[in-house]
């Protein structure tokens, strides 16, 4: 899904840049600024996904609500 979004953004940027060649200078600045914002948008999605990645055992323990002490006791 993410690759589809990147392709869509790239197609939109190509369309904007081909039309931008026909624009006057102030309009070209606006288009360049919008393209830069669109280009930075997919990178910001990764920061919304969550914090650090967890191992499967950490995910299971957090879902089950097991205390960390019990988790460490099982490893000994």
Curated annotation (Swiss-Prot):
One of its GO terms (cellular component) is synapse. Optical ganglia of the eyestalk. It is found in: Secreted. It holds the Pfam family Pigment_DH. Its main location: secreted. One of its GO terms (molecular function) is hormone activity. One of its GO terms (biological process) is chemical synaptic transmission. The pigment-dispersing hormone causes the migration of the distal retinal pigment into the proximal end of the pigment chromatophore cells and thus decreases the amount of light entering the retinulas. May also function as a neurotransmitter and/or neuromodulator. This is Pigment-dispersing hormone A peptides. It comes from Faxonius limosus. The lineage of its organism: Eukaryota, Metazoa, Ecdysozoa, Arthropoda, Crustacea.
């Amino acid at each position: 899904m993410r690759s589809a979004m990147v392709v869509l953004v790239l197609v939109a940027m190509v369309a904007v840049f081909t039309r931008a060649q026909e624009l006057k200078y102030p309009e070209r600045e606006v288009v360049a600024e919008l393209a830069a914002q669109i280009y930075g948008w997919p990178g910001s999605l990764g920061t919304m996904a969550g914090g650090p990645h967890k191992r499967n055992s950490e995910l299971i323990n957090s879902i089950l609500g097991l205390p960390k002490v019990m988790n460490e006791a099982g490893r000994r």
